[in-house]
Amino acid sequence: MKKIIISLLLLLALAIWGYTYKKDEMRDLGMGAIVDQTDKVVDKTSDYVDDVTDYLGDATKDISKEAKRIHKDVVETVKEGAAEAETATKKAMAKVTNRKLELPARLKHTPERIVEHTGFTLSFNREHNNPNWAAWELTADEAKGTLPRANDFEPDPKLPENHQVTHADYTRSGYDRGHMVPAADMKWDSKAMNDCFYMSNICPQTHALNAGGWETLESACRRWAKQEGSVYIVCGPVYKGNKHKTIGKDLKITVPEGFFKVVLSMREGKEKAIGFYYANSNAKQTMEQTATTVDEIEALTGMDFFINIDDHLEERIESSFSLKQWR
């Protein structure tokens, strides 16, 4: 609009200039009255042009001021929005960080008592007097721990006395006191080391498994923690059929038919998960033989793992596995 007005004013100025240049010739031709009348119009028009020019100058200044004010408001709004977005992002990240990615869903049809210990969480089953599962995050720094092994098996004081398994319940049973959370994973903290020797973290395992394939897998998990930055681990017993062997003196402790372990890495861009099932037997078992998908372990146990990660990511990494990706 401003450009149009300026263009019209220029045309009008040119017309006035042309008239001024030719008006003497018009007087000589007997057009003096017309010239006098036109002079009055030109004078008024010139005044209008000056007024409009002044107005446009003031308006331009006002527009410039308004534009600067609007720009300032927009910049401040954008900054405020960016600050709010950053705050919201930090809160969201804090929420994700605070979630324990290793924890499975609560069990619906199995007795469980959730027990928190230093470095790990477990779900205890009062019918089997074993953990349903034990879960923990193992970081690269924790996997490098150097504390000595505690080796003092104790009843778990966080359980009711009538379900506190003792060291004696395993004596001469023919089974090892098999750690679910291994002592070597807890060498980063003395309290964590002591807590993992509570009998609530123990299941009856054959010596061949405890000192063989299971121990090999435990060592691999520590290596993966150093490699990936951290891993999330869940493991526990597997029961098959309705009849099970039991051990124990004061308490009846069910001997599982097997054991599962699932491992998750959330290394950005290389997220992956893998599952393992080991029979509780004297047979030699390798990771190549026992590796499977997390989905298969979920079908075997009835548990739902890694529920706190994105659903699409969970579906993708739980439905397939590659042991080579973990080497």
Please tell me what each predicted stretch does.
Residues 2-327:
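Domain-level detector for secreted/extracellular nuclease and nuclease-toxin modules, and
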